[in-house]
Amino acid sequence: MKIPQFAFVALTALLMATTLPSAASETRDPSDFFFQDSFNDLSEEAELAQNEGKIGVLVVFETDDCPWCDRMKETVLNQAQVQDYFRQHFRLIGLNTDGDALVTGFDGQEVSETDFALLHNRVRATPAFLFFDTEGELLVRFTGTTRDPEEFLWLGEYVVKAHFEHERFSSYKRRRRAASS
């Protein structure tokens, strides 16, 4: 029995559609592959970042009951490409703005996660992504979610390539979106 050509093409397309997307957008648990183990000593994290040749430390502030934090973990931070890019350029630390765990700030002062978020960094909403250099200086603050993994990668690139020195992220993002259209 001979299969008609259109049926062969349709079956091939179906097979490709069911196998290619999984390879193109591999997902991994952000707890294991995005965030790194830490004793919450940010001066130590900055030193590690410097020794590893990284830009600095990305501190992600979240809360347990934050739907936007969950959305970022489920749609962006779980992407292998995002995890690999950010781990290449930053030490990645997650802190809970409602947490009681102690954090040693870049200045060596030990405070609770809550105080570090609110008093030291004025984090009022989550998720908040604060990018620090290896000296503990704040480079970029981004609060909220990104549209998709590509936009979050643009945020990383914006910091890595120091575009923040001469333009706002909204302008950079608009330019990148226009270039990719």
Which positions does each model-derived feature cover?
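Short active-site neighborhood of thiol/selenol oxidoreductases, capturing the structured segment around
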Residues: 53-66
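Bacterial N-terminal signal peptides
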Residues: 9-18
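Non-catalytic, surface beta->alpha helical segment in thiol-disulfide oxidoreductase systems
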Residues: 119-165
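Thiol-based oxidoreductase modules, predominantly thioredoxin-like and allied folds used
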Residues: 82-111
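Typically the conserved alpha-helix immediately C-terminal to a functionally engaged Cys/Sec
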Residues: 70-85
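N-terminal leader/targeting and pre-domain segments
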Residues: 25-53, 168, 172-181
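Hydrophobic beta-strand anchors of alpha/beta hydrolase catalytic cores
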Residues: 57-58, 92, 129
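Bacterial N-terminal signal peptides that target proteins for export
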Residues: 1-9
